[in-house]
Curated annotation (Swiss-Prot):
Name of the protein: Serine protease inhibitor A3A
UniProt gene name: Serpina3a
Miscellaneous comment in the UniProt entry for this protein: The single human alpha-1-antichymotrypsin gene (SERPINA3) is represented by a cluster of 14 individual murine paralogs.
Keyword Iron-sulfur: no
GO cellular component: extracellular space
Amino acid sequence: MAFIAALGLLMVGICPAVTYWATADGQLGGHTAVQKDRDHEIQLDSVTLASINTDFAFSLYKKLALENPHKNIVFSPLSISAALALMSLGAKGNTLEEILEGLKFNLPETPEADIHQNFGHLLQMLIQPENQVQINAGNALFIDKHLQILTEFKEKARALYKAEAFTTDFQRPREATKLINDYVRKQTQGKIKELVSDLHRNTSMALVNFLNFQGFWNVTFDPEDTFLGNFTLDRKRTVNVPMMKTEELTTNYFRDEEMQSTVMELNYIGNASFLFILPDQGRIQHVEDSLQPQSLRKWRKSLRPRMLDELSLPKFSLSQDYNLNDILPELGIKEVFSTQADLSGITGAKNIRVSQMIHQAALDVTETHTEADVITIARYNFQSAKIKAKIVKVDREFLYLILDPMFKSISVMGKVINPLTN
């Protein structure tokens, strides 16, 4: 199975004074020369960051689910939090506090410098080629050609967040729109074709954050075994959807009686993983209401290898976009969208606010073969774990999490209510 998630985040400041410059070759200054103890300390901090990101992810998911009832959901909490953290480099005062506290950081206990350092370390580790999964993440700022930025912001944005910048003539909104959309289309391998459609002449900055993920199942789903099966929408309705099927596999499995759901983990080559949360019929609202950071910790601690006779999953493709202007204020991030915003750390000017914040995400779940010897090893390692026949059908609404290969931070999260609805 091949999985691709492509995500774009746009911020536009309409007060005429925002820009920054950064190049694409920025690295995490200092990490290659640090001692092993310090590097180990950073990795431990990155695990803590992943836990904090889980809190943010679940809080944001609940807001999205409330705003989008009866709809499929797909978004990247990691992409959104990284973009907000990057923006906070230029924020001051209450604007800064709102952003970081909205991201679930406890500022008295967590120095701001540590937050940025660990975000940078996390993003850097994600894109390492030895991870085997293909992850491409970064930021781009499209800036008005008349504006100047502060050196400190420029250097930090480049070093910590892999930011690059493009001079843009926003007085020609059609050309500026094409420049941004062409960049996003290229970085997301064509999955997101139009992020911007209504740029105004008084726009001064557009910040794009992208996260592109491609992984290959560590199990085999033969396309010839895909069949049309029933997917239950509610008590009265079902739809016929393509169902991928595989047999005789070992996968991590946990029955959560408290949450009234089945949790199953499928791994990708390279140790990233796809977590299915399959509530009992009619209990998805209960699961959503119960989501807490400790929920993920409990699932990961409780998952055990289980031999399955058969597993069937829906084949689906999702694409959604969200206006975060309406959602982030409910998480406490308000001032940055108002005339009281203080983003003076970008240019030195205080007449800057964010007028538009858009998040688009696309997710494809399909079959992809992997090397046969991988499957053979998986099948023979745990033959003794099979006690009785076990068939798992993901044939009703479910939640899902994509966890990164190193720190198990939530890269992508969402819900499938109807696999046929894009």
